[in-house]
């Protein structure tokens, strides 16, 4: 809205743009026919809707689980999963390309950490599934590649935007962050006072067994 205001574009047009992207899954400005031609031209000249590129999609035999491989602008790739639950659709997103944690049972960490995903790249995984299914996404779990609490700021901002009623309106109570135990940011998340579920992926009751 602030960008539109700066360029003397009516405020309600920003809401229309958000609706096109996050609810109608229309990403080509020329297809946004509620906008006058001059605004569509201005958007095309000055703005970019950048989503991860869908590389492959795998669908389970029962059709209730879909896994996608997506590529970012720098050609790095991550996976995301859509699960159809009794209450609606849940998306599992990645938070990093690779991972630095070194958990021996996890394939994501084998090549080490390449980089953090941006806020837009995290949200983009959810938007792609919305576009594929044309269905509302009810819950999000940050349980794909990467340690979410090591990419704390981007993950939290992505969840806050997904919670925004104008964007996806997903309840914080329907969001889960999975961690292998990045303790400093566990406390930091607790201090946020948000009812986001924290899942601990420890796989053993003590470090000796876990490291074996």
Positions of PLM-derived features:
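Conserved alpha-helical substructure of the radical SAM core
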Residues: 110-139
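Conserved AdoMet/S-adenosylmethionine-binding subsite of the radical SAM
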Residues: 130-139, 144-212
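Canonical Radical SAM [4Fe-4S] cluster-binding loop centered on the CxxxCxxC motif
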Residues: 84-121
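Short, small-residue-rich loop/turn micro-motifs
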Residues: 72, 97-99, 202-204
């Amino acid at each position: 809205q602030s960008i539109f205001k700066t360029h003397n574009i009516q405020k309600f047009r920003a809401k229309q743009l958000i609706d096109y992207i996050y609810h109608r899954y229309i990403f080509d400005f020329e297809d946004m026919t509620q906008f006058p031609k001059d605004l569509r031209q201005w958007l095309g000249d000055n703005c970019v809707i950048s989503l991860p590129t869908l590389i492959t999609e795998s669908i389970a035999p029962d059709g209730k689980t879909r896994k996608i491989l997506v590529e970012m602008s720098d050609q790095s790739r991550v996976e995301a999963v859509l699960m159809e639950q009794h209450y609606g659709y849940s998306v599992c997103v990645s938070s990093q390309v690779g991972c630095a944690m070194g958990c021996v049972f996890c394939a994501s960490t084998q090549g080490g950490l390449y980089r953090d995903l941006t806020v837009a790249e995290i949200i983009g995984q959810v938007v792609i599934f919305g576009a594929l299914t044309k269905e509302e996404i009810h819950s999000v779990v940050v349980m794909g590649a990467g340690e979410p609490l090591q990419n704390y700021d981007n993950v939290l901002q992505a969840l806050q935007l997904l919670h925004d009623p104008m964007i996806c309106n997903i309840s914080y109570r329907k969001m889960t962050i999975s961690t292998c135990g990045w303790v400093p940011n566990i406390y930091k998340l607790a201090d946020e006072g948000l009812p986001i579920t924290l899942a601990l992926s420890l796989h053993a009751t003590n470090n000796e067994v876990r490291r074996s």
